[in-house]
Amino acid sequence: MRLKFLHLHLHGLIRSKNLELGRDADTGGQTQYVLELIKSLANTSEVDQVDLVTRLINDPKIDDEYSQEEEFVEPGVRILRFKFGPNKYLRKELLWPYLDHLTERLISYYKKIKSLISFMHTMLMLDK
């Protein structure tokens, strides 16, 4: 059985191309690092799929790309966007009240597609 990874990158301002590096504190070099990490993981023979899970944002101040539920990155890599919290963009420190809803959505999604995740990874630094 080949491995399936889920990487959480919660704030939502991440996409496969044209990264908005430096837009705010949530869009620094870590977004570039995360994209390189998931692509590298997917290119190993032991890995079948890498899902980058982030927040779906439907805000007129933010590019429409961040409101796409699924974005193909390359074979074995996709960005999945889930709605949790308000439609507008929120910096990561304000997402705490909505994480239970995201957890429920993730469990439901992976049950529905009958997929088991081998490893889940995140690099969160949330001030509570």
Kindly give the residue locations of the regions a language model identified.
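A conserved catalytic-core segment of Leloir-type glycosyltransferases
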Residues: 1, 7-15, 27, 36, ...
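Short glycine-enriched, charge-decorated loop/helix-capping segments at active-site entrances
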Residues: 20-26
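Short His-centered aromatic/hydrophobic patch
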Residues: 121-126
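Short amphipathic alpha-helical face segments that pack within enzyme cores
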Residues: 32-36, 128
